[in-house]
Structure formats: C-alpha cells, structure tokens
Amino acid sequence: MSSEVLPASIEPPNVEGKPGASDSEEERQKQRVDAEAQPISKRQLKKLMKQRLWEEQREQRKEKRKEKRKRKKLERRCQLESNSDGNDRKRIRRHVAPSNLRLIIDCSFDDLMVLKDIKKLHKQIQRCYAENRRASHPVQFYLTSHGGQLKKNMDENDQGWVNWKDIHIKSEHYSELIKKEDLVYLTSDSPNVLKDLDESKAYVIGGLVDHNHHKGLTFKQASSYGIKHAQLPLAEFVKMNSRKVLAVNHVFEIILEFLETGDWQEAFFTILPPRKGAVPAHKACESSPQDHQALPGGWDSAIEGEHGRDDPGSPHKEQQGQQSSSVSAVSPDPQ
C-alpha cells in the first residue's frame, strides 16, 4: 500500500482568515472598551438620565394629551351652550327668518369700468355676500349680467365664489329673469322716495364704480326698460358733512338692517361709516337751516354723481330749489 506525501511547498489553509483581520477587529473592540471605561462628566450623566426618564414617561404623556383633548372638547361644548342666545355669530347664528325680498346687483356695466374699479366692485360684492349670510332676515340675493372682466377677476382672485351658497349668479340681464312689474331700480335721480320695502318686489342696485363719468345712467336704464324706480329716504333722516357717496355694500346693508328693525334712521346710522360725519336731519335743521335747504334728494345706488342737480335733464330739476350738490351711492373704496 502506497502512501502519498504532501509537497513541502503546500501549507495548510489559514482557518483564522486573512492575516491582519483578527488584529483589526481586536483593535476596534479595545477602543470600545476603552471608551466605555472612560469616566463621563456630570453633565453627560444628567443628560442620559433625562433621556431615560423621557422614554419611561412616553405612555404617561400620551394619556395626558388624550385628557387635554377631551377637556378642550368639553369646554367648547359648554361655550356653545352658554352662547345659545346667539351672541356668538361665528358659531351660532341668530334665529334666521329669510325674506322673500329679492335684491339684485346689476353687473351690466362691465365695459364702462377699468380693472381697478372692477376689483373694487368685486370687494363690495364679497361684503354683500358675507353680510347676507349673517343677516337675521337674508334676502334673495342675485348677481345678474355676470361675466366679462368681473367674472375673470373673480376666477383669478376668488375661486371660492363658485361654491357660494344662497345666491343666484346669472349671466342673463335682470329683465330676462324677473317680471317687469316686480322690478324697482334704486337710483337717486328718481323723484319717488321709498317709504317701505315690499317683499314681493325685486330691488336693483347698480353695480357700477364710475367716478361721475356716466351721469344719470341707471335712471335712464330704468326708464328705457319701463320699470319702476325709487330712491332711499336718506335726506329725510340723515345730514352728512362729507360727500354723500354710498358704496354698493352700504346700500345692500342698509336694506338688510331695515328688514330687521323696520326703522330707516336706525338702518342708516348703523351702516353709514363714521367718516361720513352723519347726523340726524332734524338736528342739522335746528343748527343750520341753510344746510337743511342744501340736503340732497337722495342717493345713487349705482354710480358716483348721476345727474348733477343743475343738469337740465335731471328729474330733480323741478324739485331742487337751492340744491346744488349731487349725490351718489357707490364709493370707489369698499367698506
């Protein structure tokens, strides 16, 4: 039987791996041991203890957060119950009794306004919408002839308008939507003074920020369509030191206020901004008869300065006497 002898040049395999590998591992272990053996400072020890305590209290913090949420929920519920009388209008609306009265903003003057005034009209419409939503007796709100620059501006700057509730936004003219006998156009050039509001009627406010460029336009439009027209009884109750200009939203809010109170004077003085310097007309009469003679015959719901009082074509010409100042109702700045 023959035996084989390994050549002298062949060495047994190194079962411990490559040379130097074990040395490297030993060095790393030694470094870790040395690091653990090094004493830590009081600050580090305090930090470690704080971290450990934080981890131990994790569940307790969860429970505290749950309790806090429950407590806040209960507080909100109690607050709502305590405000059940309607004082908190943001959370609880007062008793709402919708009115049948239709209030229309006529937007058919789009091509007569520059973009700056279109934006102002848009803001005034936003205010009207917000006030109607909060009102005790909200009206049936219409925007008619909606399109052109106004619609484009609303699309670009107020995309939420498409989700507005309790409003009728129509591209058609108001005369196509409502019977002629039900329409009443509000304009300061009308010789008719409004004494009361008829909830079966539809009152039209001209949506035009004009700066006195188109005098008498709304009155002419009402006459051409053969519809009724009237002015609010502003001069009977109010004397203003400033220019007698009411924004679209002012006219809208005055009507909302009158529906709630049934009192024109209260409606005017609740809505008119302080900067107008408004005082009751009877007091102005007592203090200055001359000022009383200068009181205008009304206001203009559509544009600034429809028919000056000296205009030959003004329907106020026969009534004006010593009146010389014109009145308008749409301010270029929304309130």
Curated annotation (Swiss-Prot):
Basic residues composition-biased segments: 63-75
GO CC terms: cytosol; nucleolus; nucleoplasm; nucleus
An example Gene Ontology molecular-function term: tRNA binding
Superkingdom, taxonomy of origin: Eukaryota
GO biological process entries: magnesium ion homeostasis; tRNA methylation; tRNA N1-guanine methylation
PROSITE patterns registered for this protein in UniProt: SAM_MT_TRM10
Keywords: Coiled coil, Methyltransferase, Nucleus, Phosphoprotein, S-adenosyl-L-methionine, Transferase
Keyword match Nucleus: yes
Subunit structure as annotated in this protein's UniProt entry: Interacts with tRNA.
Protein name (database record): tRNA methyltransferase 10 homolog A
